[in-house]
Amino acid sequence: MLGTLLASCSSLQTISFDQLQAADVSFPDAVRKVAVINNMPVLKTKDNHEILSSELEGDGKVASEALAENIANVNYFDQVIICDSVFRAQDKVPRVNVILTNEEVRKLSEDLGVDMILSFDRIHIQTKPGVLFYPDFPMPIDAVDGIISPIVRVYIPNRDKPLFVVAKQDTISWEIEPALSDRKIVKEASEYAASIPVEHLLPHWDEVARFYYDGGNIEMRDAGVYLRENNWDEAYSQWKIAYEKRKGQQKMKAAFNIALYYEIKDNVEQAKEWLGKAKKLVKSGSRDEQLIAFYSLE
């Protein structure tokens, strides 16, 4: 589970690791087969390389296929079906209301043999001038920023309204170069837009960064050695000894590290309890107090 990256900063060290994040929605246990449908109209996109449009609509076929692939890769459902044929084939412009009716949801579910429908309803792309910065290049690069706003609705048969709606924004950038066109922006933005709903719909892993205290006494130094060997249980044992033996700020730092240990072990209640112990020991107005306050908000 842990991929660690350690960097020194006085007695503070940083560590990064993968942490499982919960989804924003819970599905009924009976939902094992799902379908992703393309609920967007087909709009022609210019391949003009000289003038870029400020407002664009995404490619439903590209987006729905990418969303189905992204969901299938998580291995959360037994089966993911893609229905990328155009559901709104006759639409010439995006509809204001694209919510599926109960009858449409029922028929789609029966025809496709699924328990749930994920309807990719729209991708709005707003472009504006931007800049890119590269570490080894001294000057900013002219770019186009694309503000991407996908909308995905989740349906279960026999419900009066969607179970869940994902309507989030994100931004990606393209370096301005001769091959850049509306068509390229729409294709790549549509592929990227399909990644946005997944973290809201399904449990996923995110890399998170945390601080811990290293050194200052023999127990904390030994714990740091164990931690760099990825031996969290032995590190915890040394922190616990330090907490019981030491006083003042050394005791506070041991409590803070024990809170991290319990977070790693997915024991949220114990992590909060030990963070609270550290908070009671910290000096008012110190950097340590700011650090604990930051974690208390998370």
Give the positions of each predicted feature.
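Sec-dependent signal peptide recognition
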Residues: M1-L2
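C-terminal motif of bacterial Sec signal peptides marking the signal peptidase cleavage site
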Residues: L5-S8
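A general structural signal for short secondary-structure junctions and capping/turn motifs
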Residues: V25-F27, L108-D111, D142-D145
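N-terminal segment of the mature soluble domain
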Residues: A30, V36-S119, R159-F164, S286-R287, ...
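Flexible, glycine- and charge-enriched loops at secondary-structure boundaries
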Residues: S53, E57, I141, R183
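Short, hydrophobic/amphipathic alpha-helical packing segments
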Residues: S64, N102, I148, S190-V198
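Amphipathic beta-strand/beta-sheet edge segments enriched in Tyr/Trp
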Residues: S119-I176
